[in-house]
Amino acid sequence: MNTMNTALQIRIISAVLAIIALTAWPTTATAPYTAIIMESGSPYFVPKSATVSTGAPIRWENPTPTEHTATHVGCLEDGESCAFDTGIVLPNNTFTLPGLAPGRYPYVCRIHPIMHGVIIVTDPAATPSHL
């Protein structure tokens, strides 16, 4: 009887350790991001207006055969704060911005000024919850 209890205890301990090991295994999940596609035709940036939460990553994807940029208009105006500039995003490449503070960020393609969009960053912590 004592041997059976010991065997049962070993099985239970083994099962518990296996569960702990499986739930503690590190994951390689990445934070979700908002994708903005650079297009060759209107509206050029899809979506043209993107709303994201504070600190949420934003990724520009360039599937076109042409180079593009996504440059905050503050980078182009004297005395203004430059929030981001992707630099040249080559064809079939991407640029990911780790996140922005709350605000409204209009941007353009420096190579093709007809291309423009806006990122609106909200702070979910500042929004009162409804019960």
Residue ranges and their predicted role:
Residues 1-4, 29:
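Universal eukaryotic N-terminal targeting presequences
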Residues 3-13:
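Bacterial N-terminal signal peptides that target proteins for export
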Residues 9, 24-131:
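Extracytoplasmic copper-binding redox domains, predominantly the cupredoxin/blue-copper superfamily
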Residues 14-24:
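Bacterial N-terminal signal peptides
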